[in-house]
């Protein structure tokens, strides 16, 4: 295997080899590439931006927190400990703490990422963010590490400086219902030029069969500064926190479920399940019923407060029990499951889907549901939008399949634009650039086949890259963080 060469970084990368399509794609992309980034859903840590401290090292920035990287390396037999992932039990063998060793292990296995979106994103990061032109491999690992480490010590590579450099107009974090929002208040007064907003995610409070639910409820009661003894107390406290999140700039809620079942029960039945949870005797079926009821309740509250409701369905989290018990969640062990939406969402959509005050954005890991169920529903109900390709599908071919399978049925403007959904801060511009290239290529093919003209393609390209996300998340009604 050749080592030490210059990274191939063609200007027409990811475009179709057909010269007609490529020409159109390049022209469309040239009009979208420099648009500001709107990141309406993601997992960047607000505390990192508030503190604005230098990143520690290349390994802790790029490798250890990225579950896309962890899953593929683990699949090749690379121990997670060797990548800096600490076991939950102190008695277990310790994780590697030398960032150079972690980076070398990553570089030794860089070949595993060929033709994956992770390779595309990190190639972009190395070249465009850090200015590194040599190919990453075993032989160049130290050189690349040293170059990144040197840059990370400069003021230009602190989080807020990168935020400006990345041209991020809006960045939404995802926050627990008990979050103090202190970091967001700090950022709101920092005059960053970027609007940084929280997202309300109450999932842990809805999982009443979880052994940690009691502790979550206590933390939530502390955050709301009120006793929560009944189901009505609970719902009122949720509404209070939603209002506090909205006052801090939130535009959306987020709800992760395996099955998107929606069914309203009586308040008396909901109270019985809540009391069972407080006694620690709620079953998995109790939790399923409680979650399905609370999705209905969250939709009702969204009608009233205007927060956009996001539902992420079809991911069986922590599929690998051994990895979950040893290392905890978000280690790359989430797996798609076949997911039914037509019947499961019908109660919610019949109750609220015709109300233009309500907005529901649905994401799935079940690709087969795009054309079979979600695009037809998004193409009918005024309140519903189809979310961007997610997790396994925000890839070159995955995003192209999404466009081909949904546009003819839902129409472009019933989709919610792109979101990067990432914890990997430095990958944000890479992910948006890849999406803009894929969308330009999709549109270029439509122009080449005379389905649309170049004027339509330019307008659609801008919608896909920028306008749809702002519209979907109701981001057009306020200025940037720090504006008076």
Where are these regions (language model features)?
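C-terminal amphipathic alpha-helical interaction region
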Residues: 309-311
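Metal-cofactor-binding active-site regions of metalloenzymes
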Residues: 2-36, 42-305, 354-368, 375-484
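Active-site-proximal binding-pocket segments
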Residues: 318-388
């Amino acid at each position: 295997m050749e080592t030490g060469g210059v990274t191939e970084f063609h200007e027409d990368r990811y475009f179709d080899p057909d010269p007609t399509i490529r020409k159109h794609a390049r022209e469309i992309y040239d009009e979208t590439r420099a648009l500001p980034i709107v990141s309406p859903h993601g997992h960047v840590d607000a505390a990192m931006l508030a503190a604005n401290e230098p990143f520690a090292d290349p390994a802790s920035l790029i490798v250890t927190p990225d579950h896309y990287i962890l899953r593929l390396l683990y699949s090749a037999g690379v121990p997670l400990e060797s990548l800096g992932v600490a076991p939950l039990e102190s008695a277990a063998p310790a994780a590697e703490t030398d960032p150079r060793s972690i980076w070398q292990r990553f570089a030794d296995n860089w070949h595993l990422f060929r033709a994956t979106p992770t390779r595309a994103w990190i190639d972009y990061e190395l070249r465009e963010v850090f200015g590194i032109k040599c190919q990453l491999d075993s032989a160049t690992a130290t050189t690349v590490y040293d170059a990144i480490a040197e840059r990370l010590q400069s003021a230009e590579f602190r989080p807020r400086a990168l935020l400006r450099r990345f041209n991020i107009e809006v960045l939404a974090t995802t926050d627990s219902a008990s979050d103090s929002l202190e970091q967001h208040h700090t950022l709101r007064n920092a005059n960053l030029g970027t609007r940084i907003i929280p997202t309300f995610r109450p999932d842990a409070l809805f999982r009443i069969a979880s052994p940690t639910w009691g502790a979550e409820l206590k933390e939530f009661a502390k955050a709301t500064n009120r006793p929560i003894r009944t189901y009505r107390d609970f719902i009122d406290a949720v509404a209070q926190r939603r209002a506090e999140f909205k006052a801090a700039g939130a535009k959306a809620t987020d709800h992760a479920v395996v099955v998107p079942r929606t069914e309203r029960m009586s308040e008396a039945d909901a109270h019985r399940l809540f009391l069972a949870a407080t006694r620690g005797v709620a079953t998995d079926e109790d939790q399923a019923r409680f979650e399905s009821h609370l999705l209905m309740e969250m939709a009702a509250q969204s009608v009233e407060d205007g927060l956009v409701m996001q539902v992420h369905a079809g991911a069986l989290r922590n599929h690998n029990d051994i990895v979950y018990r040893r290392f905890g969640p978000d280690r790359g062990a989430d797996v798609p499951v076949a997911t039914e939406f037509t019947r499961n969402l019908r109660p919610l959509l019949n109750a609220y889907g015709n109300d233009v005050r309500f907005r529901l954005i649905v994401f799935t890991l079940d690709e087969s549901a795009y054309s079979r169920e979600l695009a037809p529903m998004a193409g009918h109900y005024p309140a519903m939008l189809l979310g961007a390709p997610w997790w396994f599908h925000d890839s070159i071919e995955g995003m192209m399949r999404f466009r081909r399978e949904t546009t003819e049925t839902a129409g472009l403007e019933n989709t919610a634009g792109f979101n990067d959904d990432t914890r990997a801060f430095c990958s944000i511009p890479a992910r948006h650039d890849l999406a803009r290239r894929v969308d330009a290529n999709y549109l270029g093919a439509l122009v080449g086949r005379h389905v649309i003209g170049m004027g339509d393609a330019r307008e659609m390209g801008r919608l896909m890259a920028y306008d749809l996300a702002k519209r979907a998340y109701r981001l057009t009604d306020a200025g940037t963080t720090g504006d008076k």
